[in-house]
Regions:
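Active-site neighborhood of phospho(di)ester-bond hydrolases with catalytic His/Asp-centered motifs
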Residues: 16-17, 39-47, 67-70, 147-153, ...
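Active-site-proximal loop/helix segments of hydrolase catalytic cores
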Residues: 119-192
Length: 240
């Protein structure tokens, strides 16, 4: 779906949108959260279950902060899902320096989606709570290498501006259609607006609605874009 584990050159481990335990595409070896190993920081792009699901438990296991949109984490703290110190807030355009000025820095950027947090009340009834505004994240490593994780989004014109401002080396972008970009829209964004070195399609194939495929994305991107498309299998890693 969108779960991503990043290990920076300095050894910091950042996990984005962890949904592993009930995800039908998760390999058996990764169904237990302990399989992720060390986790220093968690990023959640928005409050929908397939992005938020395992994040609070992971934060508690590792005593690691779960950063997310300000409105979402305000709800998280108010409901007692996590204590405030494990649910720090920041918003679009803001940059955090969790490990000081020489460590990785993380910037929240725009995403076009929705964000509601479903959580059971004291009686066990499912209740929908405010989830803040969805975001994407630019993660800049200690060596300047940049990853843009878009979370869930439709295409929007400011993708060009974000690309110009941050010059991401790798972009992870949703292609599943129905709730997010189609493969064709995602290809247009990569080819005409962002032009990263690498593109990794995410958020497809876990439900019947998410019918977009990497093959469609690659076909729509065509040749001559200058972008290399990587299609990892669940659990596969790349070194950059």
């Amino acid at each position: 779906q969108a779960t991503t584990r990043i290990t920076t050159p300095g050894g910091k481990v950042i996990v984005i949108d962890p949904w592993l335990k009930t995800n039908p595409k998760t390999p058996a070896a990764f169904k237990e959260l302990s399989a992720l190993g060390k986790v220093d920081l968690i990023l959640v792009t928005h409050a929908h279950f397939d992005h938020f699901a395992d994040a609070p438990e992971l934060a508690k296991i590792h005593n690691a902060p779960m950063y997310g949109p300000a409105g979402m984490n305000q709800t998280v703290a108010a409901l007692g899902i996590l204590p405030g110190n494990l649910a720090p807030r920041f918003g679009k355009g803001g940059t955090i320096l969790p490990w000081g000025p020489t460590g990785p820095k993380i910037t929240a950027v725009r995403a076009e989606h929705s964000s509601e947090l479903g959580w059971k009340d004291a009686a066990g009834k499912d209740v929908v709570h405010p989830g803040g505004e969805p975001v994407g994240y630019i993660v800049e490593m200690e060596n300047g290498f940049k990853v843009w994780h878009m979370g869930d989004t439709g295409v929007f014109g400011d993708m060009r501006l974000i690309g110009e401002m941050y010059r991401p080396d790798v972009v992870l972008l949703p292609i599943g259609n129905h709730f997010v970009m189609s493969p064709q829209d995602a290809a247009m964004a990569v080819r005409d607006m962002i032009r990263p070195r690498y593109a990794i399609p995410i958020h497809y194939g876990t439900t019947p609605q998410l019918r977009g495929t990497p093959e469609e994305f690659i076909g729509a991107l065509g040749t001559g874009s200058g972008t290399t498309v990587l299609v990892p299998q669940p659990g596969q890693k790349y070194d950059f």
